């Protein structure tokens, strides 16, 4: 059993505000390609948080992949119990759909948001309950995911933990493949 933590840019950090944005198709193709590679090399669990963007896209893709890879399971982990309560209704509904399709759901903290320590506890939980991580992230273009990457790098100092990134160069390559396929 191998468990993969997937995280990365939030949708707004990539200026993606619609499911019809052409950038999203390229990102989804890159994520799907990497998820398939991971599943075919032994990953049995895809585990992500509820953030808009990479985390939700990854769970949607992983849930689709379960048709071809029935051994694959998905988990959605909330850092605290009232995550997303301030979101617009359509975003809350989309998260509820994802939550309904995953194989496992839990809150790392059963309390509503109280302080940033809950987010660090979430990172520690993810690191201690996964074997490796996949990040949609580019060090040259910082975003909130830098906090997860820093936690991973710190964890790696004392633990064997692999991290792979899909960066903007990878997305550029994926974009060229996508354009070739479209022609």
From Swiss-Prot:
Source species, domain of life: Bacteria
Database matches in InterPro entries: YspA
Pfam families associated with the record: YpsA
Family: Belongs to the UPF0398 family.
HAMAP family given in the database record: UPF0398
Protein's name according to its UniProt entry: UPF0398 protein PEPE_0933
Species assigned in the record: Pediococcus pentosaceus (strain ATCC 25745 / CCUG 21536 / LMG 10740 / 183-1w)
């Amino acid at each position: 059993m191998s468990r993969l933590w997937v995280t990365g840019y939030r949708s707004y950090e990539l200026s993606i505000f619609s499911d019809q944005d052409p950038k999203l198709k390229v990102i989804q193709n890159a994520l799907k390609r990497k998820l398939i590679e991971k599943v075919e090399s032994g990953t049995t669990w895809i585990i992500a948080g509820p953030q808009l963007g990479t985390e939700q896209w990854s769970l949607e893709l992983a849930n689709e992949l379960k048709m071809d890879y029935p051994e694959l399971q998905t988990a959605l982990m909330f850092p605290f119990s009232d995550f997303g309560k301030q979101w617009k209704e359509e975003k809350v509904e989309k998260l509820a759909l994802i939550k309904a399709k995953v194989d496992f759901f839990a809150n790392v903290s059963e309390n509503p948001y109280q302080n940033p320590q809950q987010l660090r506890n979430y990172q520690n939980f993810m690191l201690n309950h996964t074997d490796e991580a996949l990040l949609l992230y580019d060090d040259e273009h910082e975003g909130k995911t830098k906090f997860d990457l820093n936690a991973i790098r710190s964890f790696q100092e004392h633990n064997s933990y692999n991290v792979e990134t899909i960066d903007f160069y990878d997305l550029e390559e994926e974009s060229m493949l996508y354009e070739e396929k479209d022609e």
